[in-house]
């Protein structure tokens, strides 16, 4: 699997062209710069990619909706809000106090963080 994963440095709009030649999942967590990078008008390759992106609405109110609108004709877009599935926690966490459990799960963010699952329509099964 490692040969199929590419992690790089600075990514330009033209770098998304590789998405046109092979199925690609873009995992994007770039602390607010997603607004500038995820623009299918500037990055044509994004039209063929599946994208999972953390959106920082706290820096730019309404950014999730703006990014979703960029992809509405070529992709399906699902919003994933922050939620804790308590049933998925390890058993040992039950031994913690409520405060310790809160501290273990808290991400120290100033506001809620939304993820968008943006799936290319021509790839949806």
Go through the PLM ranges and name each one.
Residues 27, 52, 115-117:
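Beta-strand secondary-structure signal
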Residues 38, 58-125:
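Rossmann-like AdoMet/SAM-dependent catalytic core
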Residues 1-2, 21, 46, 72-74:
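Short, well-ordered coil/turn elements that cap or connect secondary structure elements
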Residues 23-24, 34-67:
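A short alpha/beta connector and helix-capping loop motif
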């Amino acid at each position: 699997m490692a040969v199929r994963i590419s992690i790089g440095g600075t990514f330009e709009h033209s770098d998304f062209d590789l998405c046109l030649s092979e199925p690609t999942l873009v995992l994007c967590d770039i602390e607010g710069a997603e607004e500038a990078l995820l623009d299918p008008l500037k990055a044509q390759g994004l039209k063929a990619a599946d994208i999972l992106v953390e959106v920082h609405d706290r820096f730019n109110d309404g950014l999730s909706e703006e990014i979703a609108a960029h992809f509405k004709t070529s992709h399906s877009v699902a919003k994933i809000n922050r939620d804790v599935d308590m049933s998925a926690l390890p058993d040992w966490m039950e031994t913690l106090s409520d405060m310790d459990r809160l501290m273990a799960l808290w991400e120290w963010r100033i506001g809620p963080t939304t993820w968008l699952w943006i799936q290319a329509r021509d790839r949806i099964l």
